[in-house]
């Protein structure tokens, strides 16, 4: 059984601003040059309604579904299934908690459910362990004051 990946990041924003940056503004900071299905010039859209997809639209107008929204509590919490470039039957789960602190907002990301991937679970989990560092570094960079722990 694979342990979930846990990453913590503090950003100098209110909880609502941090949440909005992570969701509705994802296209502005996500490292599409290295972490994309459709390429660097694609567009990302993050849903606001349970069951709706996280979509990457390529230059050719074709969509790739990265996951589906499970929970959406603005400024506090979100959860989504995650399967970019894979079949939905192989979806893992990402959860992000946004907690207001004196320093800004602590963002606690947990990515789990890798066992569904069978024999590739360890390799995929290890890839995401490092991949989230880059992704969250880009997210922090969009706030101008990165502080990944």
Please give the residue ranges for each predicted region.
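Hydrophobic-ligand binding "helix-grip"
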Residues: 45, 59-103, 112-114
């Amino acid at each position: 059984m694979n342990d979930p990946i846990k990453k913590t990041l503090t950003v100098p924003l209110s909880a609502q601003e941090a949440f909005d940056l992570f969701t509705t503004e994802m296209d502005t900071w996500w490292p599409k040059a290295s972490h994309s299905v459709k390429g660097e010039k694609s567009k990302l859209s993050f849903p606001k309604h349970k069951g709706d997809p996280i979509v990457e639209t390529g230059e050719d107008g074709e969509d790739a579904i990265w996951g589906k929204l499970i929970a959406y509590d603005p400024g506090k919490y979100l959860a989504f299934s995650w399967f970019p470039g894979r079949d939905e039957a192989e979806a893992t789960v990402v959860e992000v908690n946004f907690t207001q602190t004196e320093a800004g907002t602590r963002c606690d990301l947990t990515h789990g459910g890798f066992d569904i991937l069978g024999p590739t679970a360890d390799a995929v989990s290890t890839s995401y362990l490092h991949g989230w560092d880059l992704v969250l570094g880009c997210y922090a960079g969009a706030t101008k004051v990165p502080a990944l722990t």
